[in-house]
């Protein structure tokens, strides 16, 4: 589907191309032209197997003249978003959510239309590995948030968070121990 729109002084053209690479593996490439901002491309790559699945979305804008003129900064702009889930066995799992952008104005300027992510105040950067059974739960999480709102403050990292739980059930009552240990660091995203 070819899309073309025009505001009072801006022309926006895009043409998506869908590629079915093989069973459970596909990609969409979408070259774009925005008259005030230049040429760019967005893509989405999706994969699915019996033990893992995910999607990678990315966008680049090679020479954003409007951004360069307004902020006197590098005009190469980009975004990246990875979501991955994996099952190692019936009790062990991995989840990765990683998003990043070239600058705090990227989502404000392009929103979710440019790379498949919705407008948000932060880009999540999470790594979670977990193991469960009838008697325990163990979760290791590394967590950070990159603030992508120009007015955003209070970025932090959780390096790491470890949750351990043990529980026992019998006829008359249930009991257990829940614990977690977490270290916080003020700062932004993982670079």
Predicted regions and their residues:
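Short, well-ordered junction/capping motifs at the entry into regular secondary structure
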Residues: 1-2
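Outer-membrane beta-barrel proteins and related beta-barrel translocases across Gram-negative bacteria
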Residues: 5-191
């Amino acid at each position: 589907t070819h899309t073309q729109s025009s505001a009072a002084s801006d022309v926006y053209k895009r043409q998506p191309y869908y590629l079915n690479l093989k069973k459970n593996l596909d990609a969409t490439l979408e070259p774009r032209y925005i008259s005030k901002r230049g040429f760019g491309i967005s893509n989405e790559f999706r994969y699915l197997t019996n033990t893992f699945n995910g999607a990678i979305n990315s966008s680049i804008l090679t020479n954003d003249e409007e951004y360069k003129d307004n902020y006197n900064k590098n005009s190469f702009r980009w975004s990246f978003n990875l979501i991955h889930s994996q099952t190692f066995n019936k009790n062990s799992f991995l989840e990765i959510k990683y998003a990043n952008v070239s600058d705090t104005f990227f989502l404000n300027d392009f929103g979710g239309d440019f790379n498949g992510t919705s407008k948000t105040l932060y880009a999540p950067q999470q790594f979670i590995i977990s193991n469960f059974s009838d008697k325990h739960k163990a979760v290791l999480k590394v967590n950070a948030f990159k603030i992508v709102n120009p007015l955003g403050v209070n970025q932090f990292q959780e390096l790491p968070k470890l949750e351990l739980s043990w529980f026992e059930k019998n006829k008359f009552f249930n009991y257990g121990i829940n614990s977690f240990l977490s270290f916080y660091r003020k700062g932004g995203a993982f670079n």
